[in-house]
Amino acid sequence: MSIVMQLQDVAESTRLGPLSGEVRAGEILHLVGPNGAGKSTLLARMAGMTSGKGSIQFAGQPLEAWSATKLALHRAYLSQQQTPPFATPVWHYLTLHQHDKTRTELLNDVAGALALDDKLGRSTNQLSGGEWQRVRLAAVVLQITPQANPAGQLLLLDEPMNSLDVAQQSALDKILSALCQQGLAIVMSSHDLNHTLRHAHRAWLLKGGKMLASGRREEVLTPPNLAQAYGMNFRRLDIEGHRMLISTI
């Protein structure tokens, strides 16, 4: 798989790094680790929202060389939960994120996949937390999906499963898997280790802004690595063909 993004000695004051790594096309990479590990700081840096020490190459060019307009065409970024920036119908908010605004059928498909069909006419400031999270997810998917944006390469998601129930999480997993199969690189932070063990191709395990381990999910999410990151013991079980992590007292 081709390299979409290359990080070299990336650091930000005392919150992050230095750390190095690469993001590959057609893969789902999970950032895992305890609160304060640096996951959100790293995602914001990868999105081009902040600057600091070290270098990031995106699609073969320095990240800082990309204009905001061009960057928005090639990568999409979902920050942690935020309130609606203004009151507008959901359908209009989603349309604002589409590069091809004539693709109404795609908007309806993505909205339907995230169970937003009956929310399209509602104002964004009248949504519950979970509904607003799904609207935000639909927006970044519409922005970057190769179906309507051939230039789309990278999707960055900061705790996308927040406020989603089990069915909604499953629906999002299906969407992300389809985007991955179309060649998109996906990087997301997660607090659910078993979700990472099942759905990620690779993982970066962070603690205190440092990279403790990186590689294939089963190589990173080992009981010794997790004990070092979280300060507690873990066991890895095989249940009906599925690997599962549990903490032990």
Curated annotation (Swiss-Prot):
Keyword Flavoprotein applies: no
A Pfam family the protein falls into: ABC_tran
Subunit structure and binding partners: The complex is composed of two ATP-binding proteins (BtuD), two transmembrane proteins (BtuC) and a solute-binding protein (BtuF).
Organism: Escherichia coli (strain K12)
PANTHER family according to UniProt: METAL TRANSPORT SYSTEM ATP-BINDING PROTEIN TM_0124-RELATED (PTHR42734), VITAMIN B12 IMPORT ATP-BINDING PROTEIN BTUD (PTHR42734:SF18)
Protein name in UniProt: Vitamin B12 import ATP-binding protein BtuD
UniProt binding sites for ATP: 33-40
One Gene Ontology term, aspect cellular component: membrane
Record-listed E.C. numbers: 7.6.2.8
Catalytic reaction(s) noted: an R-cob(III)alamin(out) + ATP + H2O = an R-cob(III)alamin(in) + ADP + phosphate + H(+)
NCBIfam families listed in its UniProt record: PRK03695.1 (NF002981)
Function: Part of the ABC transporter complex BtuCDF involved in vitamin B12 import. Responsible for energy coupling to the transport system.
One GO BP annotation of this record: cobalamin transport
Ranges for domain ABC transporter: 1-233
PROSITE patterns: ABC_TRANSPORTER_1, ABC_TRANSPORTER_2
Keyword Hydrolase on entry: no
Molecular function as annotated in GO: ABC-type vitamin B12 transporter activity; ATP binding; ATP hydrolysis activity; ATPase-coupled transmembrane transporter activity
Top EC group: translocase
Membrane topology, as annotated: Peripheral membrane protein
Gene3D superfamilies: P-loop containing nucleotide triphosphate hydrolases
Keywords: ATP-binding, Cell inner membrane, Cell membrane, Membrane, Nucleotide-binding, Translocase, Transport
